Amino acid sequence: MASNNHFMNSRSNLSTNSDAAEAERHQQPVSNSVTFARRTPSGRYVNYSRDDLDSELGSVDLTGYSVHIPPTPDNQPMDPSISQKVEEQYVSNSLFTGGFNSVTRAHLMEKVIDTETSHPQMAGAKGSSCAVPGCDVKVMSDERGQDLLPCECDFKICRDCFMDAVKTGGMCPGCKEPYRNTDLADFADNNKQQRPMLPPPAGGSKMDRRLSLMKSTKSGLMRSQTGDFDHNRWLFETSGTYGFGNAFWTKDGNFGSDKDGNGHGMGPQDLMSRPWRPLTRKLQIPAAVISPYRLLILIRIVVLALFLMWRIKHKNPDAIWLWGMSVVCELWFALSWLLDQLPKLCPINRATDLNVLKEKFETPTPSNPTGKSDLPGLDMFVSTADPEKEPPLVTSNTILSILAADYPVEKLACYVSDDGGALLTFEAMAEAASFANMWVPFCRKHNIEPRNPDSYFSLKRDPYKNKVKADFVKDRRRVKREYDEFKVRINSLPDSIRRRSDAYHAREEIKAMKLQRQNRDEEIVEPVKIPKATWMADGTHWPGTWINSGPDHSRSDHAGIIQVMLKPPSDEPLHGVSEGFLDLTDVDIRLPLLVYVSREKRPGYDHNKKAGAMNALVRASAIMSNGPFILNLDCDHYIYNSQALREGMCFMMDRGGDRLCYVQFPQRFEGIDPSDRYANHNTVFFDVNMRALDGLMGPVYVGTGCLFRRIALYGFDPPRAKEHHPGFCSCCFSRKKKKSRVPEENRSLRMGGDSDDDEEMNLSLVPKKFGNSTFLIDSIPVAEFQGRPLADHPAVQNGRPPGALTIPRELLDASTVAEAIAVISCWYEDKTEWGSRIGWIYGSVTEDVVTGYRMHNRGWKSVYCVTKRDAFRGTAPINLTDRLHQVLRWATGSVEIFFSRNNAFFASPRMKILQRIAYLNVGIYPFTSFFLIVYCFLPALSLFSGQFIVQTLNVTFLVYLLIISITLCLLALLEIKWSGISLEEWWRNEQFWLIGGTSAHLAAVIQGLLKVVAGIEISFTLTSKSGGEDVDDEFADLYIVKWTSLMIPPITIMMVNLIAIAVGFSRTIYSVIPQWSKLIGGVFFSFWVLAHLYPFAKGLMGRRGRTPTIVYVWSGLVAITISLLWVAINPPAGSTQIGGSFTFP
């Protein structure tokens, strides 16, 4: 590993030789000199860098490499105005690979999938070939995919041949006439026929332009974020500007009027007189509901305390062991209920106003004359790991719902993390990008909801309701047919890849055998053994995981891969035409940026499962698009409400939104049986607990459907965070707080410390925190600035000026993608704080809860966004065994949290006490399983022994029991009232609480203790996702009985209680002096336990009617036999034989 540190100081190398031997990975690391070039069909190497990398990177102090591009007669630097137009086309058509001790390669792919693609943004899109003899390179194209032809004779020519022609006299190879214009930028702009964009700042490198937004904020504006400063007046009464895209008033004071002064002009007084409208509102629970709710909690706490005191004082001398066990369990249950109930004291609801969002960010204003979207960028993360358990069709539908979301196209980017590195997932994403060419414009034209094609075409409601366009029926029929063909292509991909690989493998074997025979003449030739590779559609080896795993091509050992499936869209709307199958006139046909990412995996490096994959996406997206906000989805969760992203952005862009670390959306599920047998909807958690936490510091992070602030993931403190420096005891021996000299507006970029040196974040330590990528480090202040709310009101602190985000997005170049390859390599996180303080936190099965806890612990807040129409929907395991394993994984993560430093006992003073109790309950709840199992056996032990937990059922005990039960029911009814759930959902949750508590939670505690005490690591298999292919029976998985050891405790509890009831009845009936009170008490509690386990018993029976009758007969006979045998062995007092006085009371 000695070469590792040396290699970390250099960026990955880039070349386009895709046929080089893969053994190069084992060679010594390359030098720090990196060449960015590609080879043309004529053998020339052409520079394709968009900026002068030497000048750009040389200005950074932390740079440990240099870039050398030696000029030759055939390789002269190209004019930036020409190269920028073609650079993204090259990037989107190239597959970038690289990693540890390997060269970063850009493999130019003329074909990504077997089918033809036509969208100009897509990789491998079909186009015309160069007409110059001996050249087959694609012709340059514009945003619409139309050919860029520099000569009036329309001779088709590629970029390289055009540059050759310009250098050799400027003559067109077709008509032999000189080119009238040799600048591609000019005729490209004429071909687009779009409005001119706001110009970038004059001069400066790409890095200067990238950081100029942040530089512009180092002005008096940032030092004046106080309530006494009028931002509107400063902006419109001075000639100064901050940020890009701002406008100031003309001398006549009118804006928006025509040349004659007529029109609806608006002056600064008109703007300042308009009332400021918030983006969100907090809706308090009615006092008629919440006040009795809190009063009942107080009453129940008092009654529980009195009851436990009475139970401790009044022992049962006849069965002291039974009394002791019951009291210990009741004490724990009281503590567990208290930890669960206290955080529910302050539930709230929230509402958003999308009209205000549109008015503030997408309406023409003096600071945004063109009305371009001023919303911040948003990077969407979709994670998948195994195409066998997570069907590619499900993942493709999720991608399509994201691409069709109602959010500015140029501000949206989608990153797909394929942690398995499978070619099947890669080609499925390419097929989805191709189908999006039709699906996304169709959704925009007809306002389709939901925008997941599989869910939309499976709707059981009338699809033509509220549709007024005459061509909707024709369009829907056409798109439905295309989607059916798309599904067939996706389903046939595994066989297609296998057949293709077999064909190429056979060809390679034949070539090798011919070569071997030629070299050895007539000698006996041994069979040639060639590794069976997986081949891509363009006839090259897949750099990821092969179907038949081999060295450097397995799930845990493969190179990093990045493919830009859809290149970034143009800044201006691109309207379709009436030609083709759909009339897309006045419909924007642009598609968001879509990137396939598979991080590098190598033996000896811990991959950290999903958390590691998410952190790799965070770094790659920071370099490629750097959206200040991130929303992550599991591959089986899709956008059900196309405006959900806007609703989440309302919270982030509202006043005080800069202190929000994330917006959590509730999880809603499809494909669950109508009775919700195993409480898959989990509505008590998502609609009761999460709403209650929203009234504190915010809900916990649940792993999917969460909108993050990027800098919160980076481990920064929130703006205006209160600093605490507790000593041994913060109450008595606290140290004095230093007075910070760091400006208030810059505190969001601090990671602790108060000195002037800390204001610069100790630049020498930055690589130790984030790694050695200067691109990544430079993107941090840009993301922080762009994520601020608008400074459109004096009360808005730490805001940004309106119109600052209307500038065009920078184009992707190969050097940027190469840097992204470097940051997803297996070695990048070595000796950094990724996973410990930055990004998703490692070390727990439930990395989501720990990640959210760390943010709240630093003082950030979160909000819960419940939309009228579900924001996201997904699938959940409806099979009993799968559900228990899911609960086991969650509970194991909680046990890990309890035994780690993430225990809420060690939370910082920034966390509120009730929020701390909520996180403490997250770590403690699995331990209830021990007491729950004991308590479930107590009724049976009572019936077996003829004793009860109390000596007699006196009035005091019954009154306490009645009050506790009534308060519990009333609290449940009030929770149902303010949360909106149903009584059946509440009861299903209670049932599964006992089922999970007696099975999965017990196993989780045992596994957690084994990990802590013995160091035994815990591994879980990926939960299989349903592909929705079983049309005949949607709930077929519900009836499948798959045995697991988790079923043993609940089955034992049921059997013991059933036998105990039979024994109790037999004992009482044959007793000389029947004690019916003890029997009734024991039978009542046994039936209460069995009622909770009813869904579990129903799941064991499988499909209704399929359980043989003989099973019930034998079960009854066994129960009767055991009960009679017990009575014979231990006869009732006063009876000498079975029989005797058989009398009813």
Curated annotation (Swiss-Prot):
Subcellular location: Golgi apparatus membrane
EC number: 2.4.1.-
Residues recorded with modification Phosphoserine: S755
Transmembrane residue ranges: 289-309, 319-339, 930-950, 956-976, 1002-1022, 1045-1065, 1079-1099, 1109-1129
UniProt GO BP: cell wall organization; cellulose biosynthetic process; response to cold
Main subcellular localisation: Golgi
A GO molecular-function annotation: mannan synthase activity
Compositionally biased residues, Polar residues: 1-19
Keywords: Cell wall biogenesis/degradation, Glycosyltransferase, Golgi apparatus, Membrane, Phosphoprotein, Transferase, Transmembrane, Transmembrane helix
InterPro entries: Cellulose_synth, Nucleotide-diphossugar_trans, Znf_RING/FYVE/PHD
Top-level enzyme category: transferase
PANTHER family for this protein: X-BOX TRANSCRIPTION FACTOR-RELATED
Protein name: Cellulose synthase-like protein D3
Annotated organism of origin: Arabidopsis thaliana (Mouse-ear cress)
Gene (name only): CSLD3
